[in-house]
């Protein structure tokens, strides 16, 4: 997996910031792992051109908010490279349904009929999974494939190069990345995960979306319009 791979495009600001990562042994091993998995007939999500969609949709200089997920959805047609988001025409997954419930409670935002979060990403919400690929029907299957050093570096880059961001850390996996974030520079908001297993243990009622926008406005930034159009 090299940054001149014709199938894998990376937005210019991220390519510059992450250039050294693509030459490191772990990244070469990761690329070889993915090639071998595909050669063995395994179905990998998301499709190759969408693996870096979070970075390509939200250039480094545009980042205002970071939401950290775990790995892509593992069902056909769901994942498109943005954490918690699904492609148009796909039913809204349970965790995202709870995110919408909290948005509705917190900011009175109508619940859309889809789970397509592209509009958030275009406004500066970096929707970053810590593993950028997964095997079909096998959640967490690429958790140890080598993505962690890469996505850790993404978090380090936004921590170092951006000012006054909001990091939304939902659940223990996302919160394990807190050590990469400077709390003097950025606002870190933590709660339970929006999964149905944990949403009622502190996610619903966390007020993270209004708190995010208040912080952005206090720091001279345009708040996020969290509303999404019906499709």
Curated annotation (Swiss-Prot):
One of its GO terms (biological process) is base-excision repair, AP site formation via deaminated base removal. Keywords: Cytoplasm, DNA damage, DNA repair, Hydrolase. It is found in: Cytoplasm. Its EC number is 3.2.2.27. GO terms for molecular function: uracil DNA N-glycosylase activity. Pfam families: UDG. InterPro entries: UDG_fam1, Ura-DNA_Glyclase_AS, Uracil-DNA_glycosylase-like, Uracil-DNA_glycosylase-like_sf. One of its GO terms (cellular component) is cytoplasm. It catalyses: Hydrolyzes single-stranded DNA or mismatched double-stranded DNA and polynucleotides, releasing free uracil. The keyword DNA repair applies. Gene3D superfamilies: Uracil-DNA glycosylase-like domain. The active site is at 71 (proton acceptor). It comes from the Bacteria. Belongs to the uracil-DNA glycosylase (UDG) superfamily. UNG family. Excises uracil residues from the DNA which can arise as a result of misincorporation of dUMP residues by DNA polymerase or due to deamination of cytosine. This is Uracil-DNA glycosylase. The gene is ung.
